[in-house]
Amino acid sequence: MGLETEKADVQLFMDDDSYSHHSGLEYADPEKFADSGQDRDPHRLNSHLKLGFEDVIAEPVTTHSFDKVWICSHALFEISKYVMYKFLTVFLAIPLAFIAGILFATLSCLHIWILMPFVKTCLMVLPSVQTIWKSVTDVFIAPLCTSVGRSFSSVSLQLSQD
């Protein structure tokens, strides 16, 4: 959320004589604006959101609309996407950033002061519990399972077809 100082370098050409199959938009070199500010998405978390008009609206070769319709709809798409994003960020960015900050601070506090001490306590007590559990298993459960196994090992079934 910084102050936008550069202007978008997009030009829209609508010649009556040229009927080309491209959109007519010419974009500036990305290297021109690469050093103008900091990278706001250094870990590329939102790289999937970089979509353009051709990613949303596509006309096959056999069904083309008029070039002026295509160019105007492309321009309207880009302008409305730009304006709506700016409008929504003006009203939603600060409150959502505040809410996200509170949420992450709360989760960090719970993780640091409640969850990790509980996990460390469980890991500290676990060897003692493991020793006691092995003793209980060896004294009570193993003989019971052994005797039940021996009892059922002598059972035999015979099926007769009558």
From Swiss-Prot:
<dbReference type="GO" id="GO:0019901">
    <property type="term" value="F:protein kinase binding"/>
</dbReference>
<dbReference type="GO" id="GO:0031748">
    <property type="term" value="F:D1 dopamine receptor binding"/>
</dbReference>
<keyword id="KW-1003">Cell membrane</keyword>
<dbReference type="GO" id="GO:0048471">
    <property type="term" value="C:perinuclear region of cytoplasm"/>
</dbReference>
<feature type="topological domain" description="Cytoplasmic">
    <location>
        <begin position="1"/>
        <end position="86"/>
    </location>
</feature>
<feature type="modified residue" description="Phosphoserine">
    <location>
        <position position="36"/>
    </location>
</feature>
<keyword id="KW-0963">Cytoplasm</keyword>
<dbReference type="GO" id="GO:0048278">
    <property type="term" value="P:vesicle docking"/>
</dbReference>
<dbReference type="GO" id="GO:0060161">
    <property type="term" value="P:positive regulation of dopamine receptor signaling pathway"/>
</dbReference>
<comment type="subunit">
    <text>Monomer or homodimer. Interacts with CAV1; the interaction forms a stable heterooligomeric complex that is required for targeting to lipid rafts and for caveolae formation. Tyrosine phosphorylated forms do not form heterooligomers with the Tyr-19-phosphorylated form existing as a monomer or dimer, and the Tyr-27-form as a monomer only. Interacts (tyrosine phosphorylated form) with the SH2 domain-containing proteins, RASA1, NCK1 and SRC. Interacts (tyrosine phosphorylated form) with INSR, the interaction (Tyr-27-phosphorylated form) is increased on insulin stimulation.</text>
</comment>
<feature type="modified residue" description="Phosphoserine">
    <location>
        <position position="23"/>
    </location>
</feature>
<keyword id="KW-0539">Nucleus</keyword>
<dbReference type="GO" id="GO:0007005">
    <property type="term" value="P:mitochondrion organization"/>
</dbReference>
<dbReference type="GO" id="GO:0060090">
    <property type="term" value="F:molecular adaptor activity"/>
</dbReference>
<feature type="modified residue" description="Phosphotyrosine; by SRC">
    <location>
        <position position="27"/>
    </location>
</feature>
<keyword id="KW-0472">Membrane</keyword>
<dbReference type="InterPro" id="IPR018361">
    <property type="entry name" value="Caveolin_CS"/>
</dbReference>
<dbReference type="GO" id="GO:0006906">
    <property type="term" value="P:vesicle fusion"/>
</dbReference>
<dbReference type="GO" id="GO:0005925">
    <property type="term" value="C:focal adhesion"/>
</dbReference>
<dbReference type="GO" id="GO:0048741">
    <property type="term" value="P:skeletal muscle fiber development"/>
</dbReference>
<dbReference type="GO" id="GO:0005901">
    <property type="term" value="C:caveola"/>
</dbReference>
<feature type="intramembrane region" description="Helical">
    <location>
        <begin position="87"/>
        <end position="107"/>
    </location>
</feature>
<dbReference type="GO" id="GO:0042383">
    <property type="term" value="C:sarcolemma"/>
</dbReference>
<dbReference type="GO" id="GO:0005634">
    <property type="term" value="C:nucleus"/>
</dbReference>
<feature type="modified residue" description="Phosphoserine">
    <location>
        <position position="20"/>
    </location>
</feature>
<dbReference type="GO" id="GO:0070836">
    <property type="term" value="P:caveola assembly"/>
</dbReference>
<comment type="function">
    <text>May act as a scaffolding protein within caveolar membranes. Interacts directly with G-protein alpha subunits and can functionally regulate their activity. Acts as an accessory protein in conjunction with CAV1 in targeting to lipid rafts and driving caveolae formation. The Ser-36 phosphorylated form has a role in modulating mitosis in endothelial cells. Positive regulator of cellular mitogenesis of the MAPK signaling pathway. Required for the insulin-stimulated nuclear translocation and activation of MAPK1 and STAT3, and the subsequent regulation of cell cycle progression.</text>
</comment>
<dbReference type="GO" id="GO:0007029">
    <property type="term" value="P:endoplasmic reticulum organization"/>
</dbReference>
<dbReference type="GO" id="GO:0000139">
    <property type="term" value="C:Golgi membrane"/>
</dbReference>
<dbReference type="InterPro" id="IPR001612">
    <property type="entry name" value="Caveolin"/>
</dbReference>
<dbReference type="GO" id="GO:0051480">
    <property type="term" value="P:regulation of cytosolic calcium ion concentration"/>
</dbReference>
<dbReference type="GO" id="GO:0001937">
    <property type="term" value="P:negative regulation of endothelial cell proliferation"/>
</dbReference>
<feature type="topological domain" description="Cytoplasmic">
    <location>
        <begin position="108"/>
        <end position="162"/>
    </location>
</feature>
<keyword id="KW-0597">Phosphoprotein</keyword>
<comment type="similarity">
    <text>Belongs to the caveolin family.</text>
</comment>
<dbReference type="GO" id="GO:0044853">
    <property type="term" value="C:plasma membrane raft"/>
</dbReference>
<dbReference type="GO" id="GO:0031410">
    <property type="term" value="C:cytoplasmic vesicle"/>
</dbReference>
<dbReference type="GO" id="GO:0008286">
    <property type="term" value="P:insulin receptor signaling pathway"/>
</dbReference>
<dbReference type="Pfam" id="PF01146">
    <property type="entry name" value="Caveolin"/>
</dbReference>
<feature type="modified residue" description="Phosphotyrosine; by SRC">
    <location>
        <position position="19"/>
    </location>
</feature>
<keyword id="KW-0333">Golgi apparatus</keyword>
<protein>
    <recommendedName>
        <fullName>Caveolin-2</fullName>
    </recommendedName>
</protein>
